């Protein structure tokens, strides 16, 4: 539980501190989602419940789809602006 909390806090710090870089923001969001998945997985193992393990697989697949959508938006943004920096 402490490991997942530490990973989630690292993800939040990465998201807050890297507001200008879109790629690092996407990576920070992925770290937060994987921390939540780890917490669900550890809870399901401790309670001997298969539903939590199934739900963790579902979370991982949603996180993968989210990263694909985010990176495709990033490619479209790069083609439009010529840079991935968020500075206005």
UniProtKB/Swiss-Prot annotation:
Core subunit of the mitochondrial membrane respiratory chain NADH dehydrogenase (Complex I) that is believed to belong to the minimal assembly required for catalysis. Complex I functions in the transfer of electrons from NADH to the respiratory chain. The immediate electron acceptor for the enzyme is believed to be ubiquinone. Coiled coil: none annotated. It is found in: Mitochondrion membrane. It comes from Schizophyllum commune (Split gill fungus). Belongs to the complex I subunit 4L family. GO terms for biological process: ATP synthesis coupled electron transport. This is NADH-ubiquinone oxidoreductase chain 4L. It is a multi-pass membrane protein. Its EC number is 7.1.1.2. GO terms for molecular function: NADH dehydrogenase (ubiquinone) activity. It catalyses: a ubiquinone + NADH + 5 H(+)(in) = a ubiquinol + NAD(+) + 4 H(+)(out). Keywords: Electron transport, Membrane, Mitochondrion, NAD, Respiratory chain, Translocase, Transmembrane, Transmembrane helix, Transport, Ubiquinone. GO terms for cellular component: mitochondrial membrane; NADH dehydrogenase complex. Its main location: mitochondrion. The chain crosses the membrane at residues 1-21, 22-42, 55-75.
């Amino acid at each position: 539980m402490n490991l997942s909390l530490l990973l989630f806090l690292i993800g939040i710090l990465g998201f807050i501190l890297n507001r200008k870089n879109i790629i690092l923001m996407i990576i920070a969001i992925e770290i937060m989602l994987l921390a939540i998945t780890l917490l669900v997985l550890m809870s399901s193992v401790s309670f001997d419940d298969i539903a939590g393990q199934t739900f963790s697989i579902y979370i991982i697949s949603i996180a993968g789809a989210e990263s694909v959508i985010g990176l495709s938006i990033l490619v479209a943004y790069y083609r439009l602006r010529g840079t991935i920096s968020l500075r206005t």
